[in-house]
């Protein structure tokens, strides 16, 4: 009986360690994962304000995409280009010149930059991993992101 309990406990520990939060994560259906975050491309065009609001309605903690490394930006480019071809997607930066904003719309620190001009809101090209200043009232496609 003692051996059975010991083996059962051992199997339980193995099961819990493999299924626990540290063993991996899953994004909801239709979302792609990268570095503990979930991303989704939406083939809907809207202005920056509506795009940010739209993202917050898609999943708890979701915002317009933020980038914290060139590798992450490359992941998003590789994800968006097959769907949108050569176009722009909104990213979670606005009023960066007028208000000296140093945060993404999700509240994370602006610690990676790839500027290409000045304007109120920033969009990323779906092919070149460059950020372009755009009028916030223009419409672009949307990529949302949240931490898994």
UniProtKB/Swiss-Prot annotation:
<feature type="disulfide bond">
    <location>
        <begin position="55"/>
        <end position="144"/>
    </location>
</feature>
<comment type="function">
    <text>Interferes with one step of hemostasis (modulation of platelet aggregation, or coagulation cascade, for example).</text>
</comment>
<dbReference type="GO" id="GO:0005576">
    <property type="term" value="C:extracellular region"/>
</dbReference>
<feature type="disulfide bond">
    <location>
        <begin position="121"/>
        <end position="136"/>
    </location>
</feature>
<dbReference type="InterPro" id="IPR050111">
    <property type="entry name" value="C-type_lectin/snaclec_domain"/>
</dbReference>
<keyword id="KW-1199">Hemostasis impairing toxin</keyword>
<keyword id="KW-0732">Signal</keyword>
<feature type="signal peptide">
    <location>
        <begin position="1"/>
        <end position="23"/>
    </location>
</feature>
<feature type="domain" description="C-type lectin">
    <location>
        <begin position="34"/>
        <end position="145"/>
    </location>
</feature>
<comment type="similarity">
    <text>Belongs to the snaclec family.</text>
</comment>
<dbReference type="GO" id="GO:0090729">
    <property type="term" value="F:toxin activity"/>
</dbReference>
<comment type="subunit">
    <text>Heteromultimer; disulfide-linked.</text>
</comment>
<feature type="disulfide bond">
    <location>
        <begin position="27"/>
        <end position="38"/>
    </location>
</feature>
<protein>
    <recommendedName>
        <fullName>Snaclec stejaggregin-A subunit beta-3</fullName>
    </recommendedName>
</protein>
<dbReference type="InterPro" id="IPR001304">
    <property type="entry name" value="C-type_lectin-like"/>
</dbReference>
<keyword id="KW-0800">Toxin</keyword>
<dbReference type="Pfam" id="PF00059">
    <property type="entry name" value="Lectin_C"/>
</dbReference>
<dbReference type="InterPro" id="IPR016186">
    <property type="entry name" value="C-type_lectin-like/link_sf"/>
</dbReference>
<feature type="glycosylation site" description="N-linked (GlcNAc...) asparagine">
    <location>
        <position position="78"/>
    </location>
</feature>
<dbReference type="InterPro" id="IPR016187">
    <property type="entry name" value="CTDL_fold"/>
</dbReference>
<feature type="glycosylation site" description="N-linked (GlcNAc...) asparagine">
    <location>
        <position position="47"/>
    </location>
</feature>
<dbReference type="InterPro" id="IPR018378">
    <property type="entry name" value="C-type_lectin_CS"/>
</dbReference>
<keyword id="KW-1015">Disulfide bond</keyword>
<keyword id="KW-0964">Secreted</keyword>
<keyword id="KW-0325">Glycoprotein</keyword>
């Amino acid at each position: 009986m003692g051996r059975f309990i010991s083996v059962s406990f051992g199997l339980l520990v193995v099961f819990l360690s493999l299924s626990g939060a540290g063993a991996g994560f899953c994004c909801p259906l239709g979302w792609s994962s990268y570095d503990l975050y979930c991303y989704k491309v939406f083939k809907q065009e809207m202005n920056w304000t509506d795009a940010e609001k739209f993202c917050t309605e898609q999943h708890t903690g979701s915002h317009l995409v933020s980038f914290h490394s060139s590798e992450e930006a490359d992941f998003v480019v590789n994800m968006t280009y097959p769907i949108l071809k050569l176009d722009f997607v909104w990213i979670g930066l606005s009023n960066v010149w007028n208000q000296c904003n140093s945060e993404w719309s999700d509240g994370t620190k602006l610690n990676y930059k790839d500027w290409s001009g000045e304007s109120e809101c920033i969009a990323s090209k779906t092919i070149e991993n460059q950020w372009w200043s755009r009028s916030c009232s223009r419409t672009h496609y949307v990529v949302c992101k949240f931490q898994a």
